[in-house]
Swiss-Prot record:
It is found in: Secreted; Nematocyst. This is Delta-actitoxin-Bcg1a. The lineage of its organism: Eukaryota, Metazoa, Cnidaria, Anthozoa, Hexacorallia. Binds specifically to voltage-gated sodium channels (Nav), thereby delaying their inactivation during signal transduction. Thus it strongly stimulates mammalian cardiac muscle contraction. GO terms for cellular component: extracellular region; nematocyst. One of its GO terms (molecular function) is sodium channel regulator activity. Disulfide bonds join 4-45, 6-35, 28-46.
Amino acid sequence: GVACRCDSDGPTVRGNSLSGTLWLTGGCPSGWHNCRGSGPFIGYCCKK
């Protein structure tokens, strides 16, 4: 999967670890949660 930035990773991508996984359709898989709260974002940033 493609890494994405969770809200807990910090305000910017540069210098921060990306702990989420990008899911484009259907929301996050079972047992995962969306870790990205708001902002212009395509798909869902999911985390176990």
